[in-house]
Amino acid sequence: ASCLVGSEMCIRDRGRAIPFVDEGDGPVKLVLIQEQGLAADVLGVAAHYLAEEAGFHVLRIGHRSESEATLDERVEDAIAVIDHVGIEDTWVGGHGFGGTIARALVSAHSDRANGLLLLGVEDVDIAVAPAIPVLIVQGTEDTDTPAANAEALQATIPDRSSIKTIAGDHLFPMHHPIETGVIIEEYLDWD
């Protein structure tokens, strides 16, 4: 069932409300999972750019209100929204902890993903699914998800991962949304 949280749509699934924003209808599809615990919509402008200017179909997924959910439950939340919207053949990505959820989702459901997009990389031990390309966008001054994490991940899959940098801290997607969007657009829409 659909519901409304502020100005965002949400779905109610097994008693939890999961907010999301669905924009655009282009052939290139991208699921973006928000960082946790930020009041601001850090990915909003970059996602809007991708939907309006690049012609992508972008699904942004937030977090249920209770913060005690496990990583697996958060993956289930994202899958529930993806299924509700009906997106297939998509890149899956996220910012900070949202990227960790995306990594876990793609690791467990690699058949549902065309690629993995990480806006900052948390230091977690989650294997990247075989044959999945990975784009990492890294803030040069990011101390929450430092460049060393991105470099360590890339070292495990050098043949199918790329790191692009943006001047800025952990909130680079909000402070430099168009630059973030252009990097994503050029990588995902190269063909």
State the predicted function of each range.
Residues 1-11:
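Single conserved hydrophobic/aromatic residue that forms the stacking wall/gate
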Residues 111-123:
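A conserved short beta-strand
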Residues 94-98, 102:
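Gly/Ala-rich beta-loop-alpha elbow adjacent to hydrolase catalytic centers
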